[in-house]
UniProtKB/Swiss-Prot annotation:
Transmembrane segments: 4-24, 32-52, 60-80, 96-116
Keyword Membrane: yes
Predominant cellular place of this UniProt entry's protein: membrane
Signal peptide location: none
Organism classification: Bacteria, Bacillati, Bacillota, Bacilli, Bacillales
Keyword Cell membrane: yes
NCBIfam families xrefs: PRK13673.1-3
One GO CC term on file: plasma membrane
Name of the protein in question: UPF0344 protein Aflv_2205
Assigned protein family: Belongs to the UPF0344 family.
Pfam families assigned: DUF1516
Compartment(s): Cell membrane
Topology term for the membrane: Multi-pass membrane protein
Annotated source species: Anoxybacillus flavithermus (strain DSM 21510 / WK1)
Keywords: Cell membrane, Membrane, Transmembrane, Transmembrane helix
Length: 118
């Protein structure tokens, strides 16, 4: 299930970048892509919940990773919505980068992730 979770994250990040690029050009298909990205948010949460459910106990760092992961999803959504409305997104981009780095670190550090930081 870890691979499914990582795959949904990668696809969601690609869709996010494409949606931002299309939004900058004023493309008409951006709304459809945004809805598809929301579906991937649900898949990310579902696969993450499945991974968490498969564990026998919930150490504190896993709970932190869940919260930071939801923070990443929230900032992605807020960036897309505020960009569509023409509002400033600088603070949201900073939050996204910080949260993304933290969630990647926790994902690779914790036992269910890949061992880059052992």
């Amino acid at each position: 299930m870890t691979h499914a979770h990582i795959t949904t994250w990668v696809v969601a990040l690609i869709l996010f970048v494409v949606a931002i690029a299309l939004q900058a050009k004023g493309h008409e298909k951006t709304k459809m892509l945004h809805m598809l990205l929301r579906l991937f948010y649900i898949l990310i949460i579902a696969t993450g919940a499945w991974i968490l459910h498969s564990m026998s106990s919930f150490p504190f760092l896993y709970i932190v990773k869940v919260i930071v992961g939801l923070w990443v999803i929230g900032t992605m959504e807020m960036i897309l919505v505020r960009t569509a409305k023409g509002k400033n997104t600088n603070v949201l981009w900073l939050q996204f980068i910080v949260a993304f780095v933290v969630v990647l670190y926790l994902g690779f550090k914790l036992p269910f992730g890949f061992s880059f930081f052992s």
